[in-house]
């Protein structure tokens, strides 16, 4: 599972997910990518499930880059506990994803294999996604 090695503070505010992604909106390493269409928290378990789905379908061919990292802790109080008495215990880690962010990239496989692998990965994620591929001049073309 992905998680930070150490953090300065164990608990964080939830924060807002306004606007579009500032960086990471273009394909940097691979040939094909999976782009978020909405804002969401993505847990380290969801990232791992998507990675496994992609690599299983590609059968050890190609390379996968994970472009998001769960660096934000989220907390939860136990069941049937009254309100108050402090913030809950850290429960897990999430990556904050905004619209336009490229979450995964793939290289070394055909477009059909990449499209299906990224479709399987998108089913594991709580956010609507779009398949994008790199253009010759370095950007990406948005194809569905």
Swiss-Prot record:
The keyword Ribonucleoprotein is annotated on this UniProt entry: yes
A GO biological-process term: translation
GO cellular component: cytosolic large ribosomal subunit
Entry-linked Pfam families: Ribosomal_L16 (PF00252)
GO molecular function: rRNA binding; structural constituent of ribosome; tRNA binding
Transmembrane portions of the chain: none
UniProt record similarity statement: Belongs to the universal ribosomal protein uL16 family.
Function noted in UniProt: Binds 23S rRNA and is also seen to make contacts with the A and possibly P site tRNAs.
Protein name as catalogued: Large ribosomal subunit protein uL16
Lineage per the UniProt record: Bacteria, Bacillati, Bacillota, Bacilli, Bacillales
Gene (UniProt): rplP
């Amino acid at each position: 599972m992905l998680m930070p090695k150490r953090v300065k503070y164990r608990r964080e505010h939830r924060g807002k997910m306004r606007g579009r992604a500032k960086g990471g909106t273009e394909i940097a390493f691979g040939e094909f990518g999976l782009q978020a269409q909405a804002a969401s928290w993505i847990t380290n378990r969801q990232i791992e499930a998507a990675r496994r789905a992609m690599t299983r379908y590609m059968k050890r061919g190609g390379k996968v880059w994970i472009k998001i990292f769960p660096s934000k802790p989220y907390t939860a109080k136990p069941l049937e506990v009254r309100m108050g008495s402090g913030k809950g215990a850290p429960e897990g880690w999430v990556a904050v994803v905004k619209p336009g962010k490229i979450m995964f990239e793939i290289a070394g496989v055909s477009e059909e294999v990449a499209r299906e692998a990224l479709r399987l990965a998108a089913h594991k994620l709580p956010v609507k996604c779009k398949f994008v591929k790199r253009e010759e001049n370095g950007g990406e073309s948005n194809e569905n």
